[in-house]
Amino acid sequence: MASPAVATRRPSPTFLVSGPHHRLRRHEYSPSKLGSPSSASRLKVTALFGWIKGDRVARTRELIPSAESYTLTGSASEVDMKPREVSISVVSSIMDIPPAEWDACAVDSAEPEKLNPFLTHAFLSSLEESGSAVKETGWLPLHVVARDENGDIVGVVPLYLKSHSRGEFVFDQSWAEAYHSYGLEYYPKLQSCVPFTPVTGQRILLRDTSYRDQVFDALVKALKNLATKLNVSSLHITFPSEGEFGNLKDRGLLQRIGLQYHWRNRNYKSFDDFLMDLKQPKRKNIRQERKKIPAQNLKMKRLRGDEIKSSHWDTFYKFYRNTTDNHWGRAYLTREFFHLLGEKMGDKVMLIVAEHDDKLVAGALNLIGGDTLYGRLWGCLPDVHFPNLHFEACYYQAIEAAIELNLSRVEAGAQGEHKIQRGYLPVTTYSCHYFLEPGFATAIGNFLVHETAQVKHVINVLRDSGPYKEDIMKEFAPQLDNEM
């Protein structure tokens, strides 16, 4: 879970490597390779974010290209596969897609342990319905849909036309500055992601069919074609799965890596079991931090489903706004979003709250996946200061909950090297990028080669400083190495 203090403290070494402070230098690209900016052709698309009057729905439909047909053929090992036709189209709202059909692609019924709640229709529609991820906030939905000959949906891609780089957690502001310095427009751009959510997961969502690999290929081609038709600068697929990361490289997208901090469950039966895997000084420190919670007359509760009332969401929204107003400077999520989340996904939501004298003073929002607890947001009342409460609510309570629910891991969000000493180890995250300007594609590709080496070095250094005993780290090593 990202610490709100990141915005006001000295940037961490990791942030300097992968964040907006790391610049693409002018000598790394040549204007002679770029050509002149086609400002006239871009102007119409850019204006989408400046609508003032008129029928917005009609104008959105003008933007959306007509459906395209793709013929699917088998690979070399599938020579007997009958050619199939799929039609790929774009919709301006996820509400145009039946929830059951979207989720048939996003949720693998054969492997429920892989459920990613952020990819469900319920979560994404809550973002749109609440006015959080919509055209007015710079997130114009352009979701891509693949249908078979019978009109059944066999694949979808959550996609947005964006007028900025906020709420993404993969920093490309220096790329935008480089475009601007040569008179080119970086925005709008296409972004496949879960808005405001740095969680790894599938981005090309496929129904379980015998020809899903071919649908994947068709959808990637359609994404590239859409970028060309809209005449945007680029296409970005952020926080894809590791498998998609490799497949998208094979299809011409540039690769970028970052890092997060995750906790892993070694079949622990209790929090004390987990502590016994740590070096003695780290174990002692955590116990001391946890003792300070009851000593400050704080009571922790983990609420789920119907236990979370409307009043809880109103209070948590105050916590959230206190965090954004004092640290981030922008509230991406509306009050209505939290209420919709509770209504649509109550069984997948865990709200960890702290009470002081029977009054809610702080809270942490988590979502429950098939095998993972996802820590998302943290906040407290203004002027509230209880030492170690952030660590308790965001990290230790999450670990306890994961052990109780028999979940394999806790993903505690972006940034925060302080998580390492509390049992969260650095893991690799992924993103893929496609640029229509060949000169910039080459320059950014070269930049990413050097950045990747730096990020891998940082991950190795951070792992060496981990809190676990040496034999435990040896057990973790194969998994961690595979993720690099």
Residue map of PLM features:
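N-acyltransferase acceptor-side catalytic subdomain
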Residues: 2-484
